[in-house]
Amino acid sequence: MADGRLNVKDFSSIAVKPYRDGAIWSEAFSVALLKNKKLYIPTGRYYIDKSVVLKSGADILADKDAEIILIKGVKTLLLRNESVADGSTGRIAETHKRDEKISIEGGIWAEENDERLGYGASGAFDEEDSFHGVSTCFLFSCVKHLRLENLTFRHTAGFAVQIGEIDGFEIKNIVFDGCFADGLHINGNTVNGVIENLSGHTEDDLIALNAYDWDNSSINFGRIENLVVDGVYAAGGENAHKSMRIQPGIYPYEDGTTEDCYIKNLRIKNVVGAATFKMYLQTPAYTDSPEKPVGVGRIENISFENISADTREPVDRQPNYLNCDPVTGNFATFEVGSNVKGINFRNVRVLLDKSKYPNAYFMTVGPKSQYIKEKGLELFDPYIDCVLSGMTYEDVYINGEHVEDISPFVKEINFGNIYPSALPFGRGVIENNKE
């Protein structure tokens, strides 16, 4: 090509293993990228049976109808960068190599899956699942300057895209087509990024900004800072989960040290179709006490602008929400279970069905609980204490009506003793707020 790209079809002689209506192209992709970091993928169908690994400077351009498909039964992920590092047991050294300037534009990136898997069953880092927190189709970790644009992800069994330890990124014009878990899953030590125009159907969080995360869902823990999310459309359909997660926390390493996984300077605007923005700590389900002493995290300077949310039903279809439990059945468009300092709402339109769900709110602040008594199992973290301060708002609409005072639609949650527990139950506090 004129720009010096290699055409992957020039390596078709390597793709000799037949599969379905085509052939396995994994080796052809790898050889082409070794010869030239700039690769062109024309319209066609390319089956992949092992991970494609990108080095610094990799630049892939695919036609919009080019289909790159990870075949059924492959345990490992479809594509990743070379210098991935696992930070789940300790901080990644500053001297660890970072890949630089990786770009992928165009194409349909798919898996031959029809259900949620991940967590070692699919989307693994390698056959040994040596980085257990990897559960995805695309993985980028330890990268400076990442660009993903005009991509469609189809039928991904784990996350569609998982990134962490990234400095400087643009992720634009991404479609999720029948994806069974999270769409864009961002983990810690990720800074200076722009996310624009994400849409589609996912069956878990459309976007997860998880500075803190579970050990089976992240290898990178730390701050998320200086991000803009502009343009999100959450599609409906059976099993659609129309939510965005924003999760800080205090992550404990094995040696007893901790990581402050805070979120700071986050601007979210032009979102349509979301039901809930989850800003609470959630650790893995547990009996008696959480498996790790994770601390409540902090969010500083977050804004929501031009948001249209439909929260007429709870996004978490748990019995206490559906049955309107007067203590634990509260749910909201904005659910806060972190320490928040500086939060602004501007032109936010929310639908609530207070007649069916009197415990539905614009915002709740405090802990959540779903306790399964017969199993002694807690799904959330009812021991959380948190404070929200510095809230400002303008042009808030509830069910189409402009609301001058949002206090009737905001609730501080205080559980008291809701069941026998060795841990004290928590409460949320709102202070220092103004219009």
Protein language model regions, located:
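Extracellular/periplasmic carbohydrate-active domains that bind, remodel
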Residues: 1-435
